């Protein structure tokens, strides 16, 4: 069994009871942290099998709007399909690039600025890559964004929402975090996907910066901005790794 399949099967054991949203292996320890366990966990955002690039993050964070969005039936259903990696033919696997959810706070962080714009959150980390991909392959911005949504995935070390991650000691104890690290080690060893670690690199287990064809690890001093601009090692590496967009991509 591949590491990707093992990770997906691990999360297939999660059951949505609608009250406490936690993987059964994490149930006791997760309650000790400052996690918002009424929200669905988000260990992976994107299609892990098809992704050509995987971006490592610490945890999904917490926004005041998250609660309202999870009451949106269409969005919650998309979250659950993503959690089980059972994406539909019309899904945008990296959900924050889905035009239907372009007012989600995650969309402003990863994709394009929302209206009204919120400066601290509207970092649009993948926007430069989308625009460069559209120019490189001669397709529309919409087609390029759809391609990135299928070929880039975000892997969280901790799958649970938290504003501050006050109990970082739990990152070395939660079974789901250990599974994420196990997956990371397999991805790095195989080199089949580009892995980009921009933030919390020490928590992921990296001792310092790395720059190879299949692994980019930022210096810890770059962790605050965690830029994926084309001038950054991570952004330029992702663009190089991405396959060409089909001309008729929607």
PLM regions: where:
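C-terminal end-of-chain micro-motif
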Residues: 1, 249-250
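Glycine-rich anion-binding loop/nest that anchors nucleotide
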Residues: 55-59, 192-204
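A polyanion-binding, active-site-adjacent surface
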Residues: 2-190
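Feature targets compositionally biased, intrinsically disordered low-complexity regions
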Residues: 45, 107, 207, 222, ...
């Amino acid at each position: 069994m591949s590491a990707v399949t093992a990770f997906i099967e691990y999360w297939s054991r999660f059951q949505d009871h609608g009250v406490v949203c936690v993987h059964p292996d994490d149930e006791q320890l997760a309650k000790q942290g400052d996690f918002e366990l009424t929200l669905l966990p988000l260990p992976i955002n994107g299609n892990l099998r098809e992704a050509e690039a995987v971006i490592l993050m610490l945890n999904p964070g917490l926004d005041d709007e998250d609660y309202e969005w999870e009451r949106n039936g269409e969005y919650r259903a998309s979250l659950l399909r993503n959690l089980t990696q059972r994406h539909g033919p019309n899904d945008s696997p990296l959900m924050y690039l889905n035009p239907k959810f372009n007012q989600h706070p995650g969309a402003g962080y990863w994709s394009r600025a929302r209206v009204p714009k919120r400066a601290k959150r509207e970092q649009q980390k993948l926007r430069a890559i989308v625009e460069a991909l559209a120019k490189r392959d001669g397709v529309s911005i919409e087609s390029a964004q759809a391609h990135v949504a299928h070929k880039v995935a975000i892997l969280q070390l901790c799958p649970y929402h938290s504003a501050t991650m006050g109990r970082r000691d739990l990152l070395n104890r939660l079974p789901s975090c250990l599974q994420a690290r196990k997956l990371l080690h397999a991805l790095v060893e195989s080199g089949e996907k580009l892995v980009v670690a921009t933030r919390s690199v020490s928590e992921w287990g990296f001792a310092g910066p790395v720059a190879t064809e299949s692994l980019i690890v930022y210096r810890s001093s770059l962790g605050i901005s965690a830029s994926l601009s084309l001038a950054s090692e991570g952004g330029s590496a992702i663009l190089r790794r991405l396959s060409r967009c089909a001309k008729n991509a929607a």
